[in-house]
Amino acid sequence: MSMLCYTLIIAFLIGIWAAPKSEDNVPLGSPATSDLSDTSCAQTHEGLKTSRNTDQRHPAPKKAEDQELGSVANIIVDPKLFQKRRFQSPRVLFSIQPPPLSRDEQSVEFLDNEDTLNRNIRTKRETHPVYNRGEHSVCDSVSVWVTNKTKATDIKGNMVTVMVDINLNNEVYKQYFFETKCRNPNPVPSGCRGTDSRHWNSYCTTTQTFVRALTMEGNQASWRFIRIDTACVCVIIRKTDNF
C-alpha cells in the first residue's frame, strides 16, 4: 500500500515538472521572450514611423521672426566682395566671434585674425585714450554692438533687408554694427549739460550716418548704404520770450 502511494506521488511530481511553463515565467533569451521583444519593437517602430509621417504632413508653424532670420542667414557670398577697400566701414564688422557688448566694459578690438576688415580704425581708437580731467560731455551717449539688425533704411529711403550671417570661404561670419545713441535726452533738468537755460531750450538727440553694409538684393548679396545711429548731439533753440 505504501509503495502504491509513493508511486502516485512520484508520478504527480513528474507530471508537474513536465508541464509547459507560462510566458510570464520564461527566462530571458528564450524563444517566447524573443517573440515578445520583436513584437514590442515592431509596434514601437510602427508608432514612431506614424508620428514622423504626421509631423512631416503637419510641420510645426515657425515664428515670423525665425522665418525672417532664416531668409538672410548663412548666405554664401563671393570673396571678391571684400577685396575693394571702398566698401569697408569702421562701424561694420564681420567676425566669427561675438564682439564685446560695450566699449565701456572692455576695449573694442579686432576679433578675428583671419579677417582684415576694420583693423586700423580700432587700433587708432585705443591709442588715444581719454582721461578724466574735469571735462564733461554736453550729452551722455552709449555705444553698443548691434548683433541682430535685419532691416534698415538705405540712402534712397527704402527699407532693405540686412544680412545677418554670411558664408565666406566655408566660414560663417556675422555682420555687426557699432552704434552710438543718446543715453538720456535730458542729462540735466534744463536739457543739455552746460547750456544757458535762461536764453536757450535744449535737448539731446541721436543722429544717424550712412555706412556700407551687406544687404540682400533679390537672391544676391550686395553692398548698400544704410542708416545707423552714430552720435548723440545737443539741439538748442532760442527762447521766444527774448525777442
Curated annotation (Swiss-Prot):
Comp. bias intervals (Basic and acidic residues): 47-66
Keywords from the named record: Cleavage on pair of basic residues, Disulfide bond, Glycoprotein, Growth factor, Lipid-binding, Metalloenzyme inhibitor, Metalloprotease inhibitor, Protease inhibitor, Secreted, Signal, Toxin
Residues modified by glycosylation: 148
Main location per the UniProt record: secreted
PROSITE patterns, alphabetized: NGF_1, NGF_2
Single Gene Ontology MF annotation: growth factor activity
InterPro entries: Cystine-knot_cytokine, Nerve_growth_factor-like, Nerve_growth_factor-rel, Nerve_growth_factor_bsu, Nerve_growth_factor_CS, Venom_nerve_growth_factor
UniProt region (Disordered), positions on chain: 47-67
Propeptide boundaries: 19-125
One protein family per Pfam: NGF
Highest taxon of source: Eukaryota
Record's signal peptide: 1-18
Tissue: Expressed by the venom gland.
GO cellular component terms, A-Z: axon; dendrite; extracellular space; synaptic vesicle
Subcellular location: Secreted
GO biological process, one term: modulation of chemical synaptic transmission
Cystine residue pairs: 139-204, 182-232, 192-234
Keyword Signal: yes
Complexes and interactors: Homodimer; non-covalently linked.
Annotated function: Nerve growth factor is important for the development and maintenance of the sympathetic and sensory nervous systems. It stimulates division and differentiation of sympathetic and embryonic sensory neurons as well as basal forebrain cholinergic neurons in the brain. Its relevance in the snake venom is not clear. However, it has been shown to inhibit metalloproteinase-dependent proteolysis of platelet glycoprotein Ib alpha, suggesting a metalloproteinase inhibition to prevent metalloprotease autodigestion and/or protection against prey proteases.
Membership in a protein family: Belongs to the NGF-beta family.
Name the UniProt record assigns to this protein: Venom nerve growth factor 5
